């Protein structure tokens, strides 16, 4: 690199170490990028691409960003999936001998961004590490901004995707084996918007992982961390920690606890079900408004909002834990005044979790400390109010909550009420906190007064009436005495300069004043910065206490929110059972009732059990409310996260997982048709559901022909109803009225329909679920409601009358039920299983016969094309 300038050589050496990053290289007041980085950044950020002399004949492509505006540009690059290495000047350019020393102080990636402006305060920003070894997946998840750190293991790709969907990380790092395992990496990148990298093999050595973990958490064995049974997970946790060390360039003190967890502790909700039930965002707009979380979230703090989201995404399956949460909600609603006082005290609390991370990273500014102080000032009254409650969970929250009064007092004494953002501009430390600060501050403001006082004192003391204190840049401050008073100059005056008509002197006292006055500004700024850093370090040393307190505040915020929602919306406390009974009286959909006038929502009952009410077949027209009814039952996730539920009363049998098959759409990205997507989801449900699961199946089989669809739907119901094969509790909505014939043939299947009132050709949807099967689909009436032209409606009525002669219900009545035996079924020879065409009454029999007689094997390609063209013209001309 001899041809490059010294500065460019330094840049290229640094870039060589961080090849996979965009290098932000600090030059004075700018971060500059060169060569490929400059071209990429100028394009993505729409910056002007210029050139810089680098020692070669051609100028190096270059673009720059002002250092004071870097966050906005940086966040945009990171949001686009880039890694950015920040290379700072690590010595004062004024003191540098030769080239200023520079070092990369941090690497910012999508999963490690700490900028509060870039992060959604109500959502964690997770980074996930996946290790694939011996058909198992080790999974470790961290939120660097809050210090959360989790680890688990799963044994299938589907379970892995459930974890990915649950945590929704913005970045995944993995070993090469996972990258090459056949997992759809592009799907992760593009559909789920996740940045994913495969790291070098050495990151995933088990010895390195173990050493990294034991050293960081200061323990002597994996047992102490709860990782003894997590061989694969331990490697993932160690590799992730190593990666964070390398990107964050600090000791990661905010990651103080690791949480191993078993996926069996929570209800399993796969990605399809999460989307269909709209737990945290709506299916189409991807917005919070309209989701279950939107209804429940009355939290006052960012920490509470994040914790509530995790509760919604991870419902419990342990009865005691669920009831423990219910007890907290119950008691909060028994003390409404105290509950509202708690909300008032929670309201001013800032994001303590992310604030303490900034403190431990030494990036917290003075205003962050003021926000921290105003937050922890709320803790003593909150803890005092919690003393009024008796339930176990609120007692645990009170126990975990530290009032942190000494930290509040420290900040109160030390930091100005309205300090600047910058730590280098002074104005940080309060008067009275430090003697030297007070002295320098006084020198800065009262220096002229001190000089005038000294001048008067020396004039009186010496009798030199024209003695003056003056200043120049060469000598600083000095005493000037004219020659006429030279004889009165005392011995302690030290001559500095002789002029034609006067002498210039200094004294020890004047020199001391000079040092204080001239250096006061710089010394004050430096001292204030040092004192601020001391205060910040004192707070950082208490990170474990602060994080535990933050979690307690978040938990309180969640339960106060759930209590308020239950109170305002007339929710009831569900009785949790382990015998499989789901008995909901007057159930309502929590979201729909909020989106419309509450008085307009029609409530409904639901009863399912492990005996004769295992499956409910629900029939009725579109728009009648079948899907809303089924989804509101599925939202028993509310009960298992510990919340009250929208119903008059509810008994909820714990379910281990919920599956939904709702709606239909092509998966164009993977080349799958609507029907293939549907069948993939059905296959997943039948293979992974258990007898303790809840299934919500809407219109199984509608993506194919009538007979095929009916046959599949029928067989699916038979499979689910058989306790030896599955036996899961199921709500099964269908347009195939023929499935109502299963009631009576299968002793655990029951028919329900949506009540409809007919007024001539018009219909009124009553939105009420009643016993029995629907005998009509009312499709034409729904089409009329939708505004389909009258001519089309009239023609549809004619066609449906003709088609009704081909009723397949009679066929369904004669189908034998699969009981699981090996006995051969009777053939239904009299049934034509050909797809029933909409226009069976006007078949083109001659064209079909001609097509049947074509000898395809002996046609040339051009003859085949001509024959196809001929047949097509016949069809066109006929219609």
Where are these regions (language model features)?
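Charged catalytic and DNA/RNA-contacting regions of genome-maintenance
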Residues: 1-331, 347-360, 364-456, 820-829, ...
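ATPase nucleotide-binding head domains, primarily ABC-like/P-loop NTPase cores
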Residues: 35-38, 230, 300-301, 311, ...
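C-terminal tails and terminal domains of large nucleic-acid-associated
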Residues: 837-879
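Amphipathic heptad-repeat alpha-helical coiled-coil/stalk segments that mediate oligomerization
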Residues: 204-212, 219, 267-271, 283, ...
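Active-site phosphate-binding and catalytic loops of NTP-dependent enzymes
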Residues: 87, 110-119, 251, 389-393, ...
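Charged, surface-exposed helical/loop "interaction arms" that form contiguous linear patches used
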Residues: 361, 365, 375-378, 431-432, ...
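Conserved catalytic alpha/beta cores of large enzymes that bind or transform nucleotide phosphates
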Residues: 164, 169-177, 183-186, 198, ...
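Amphipathic alpha-helical coiled-coil segments
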Residues: 322, 329, 339-345, 372, ...
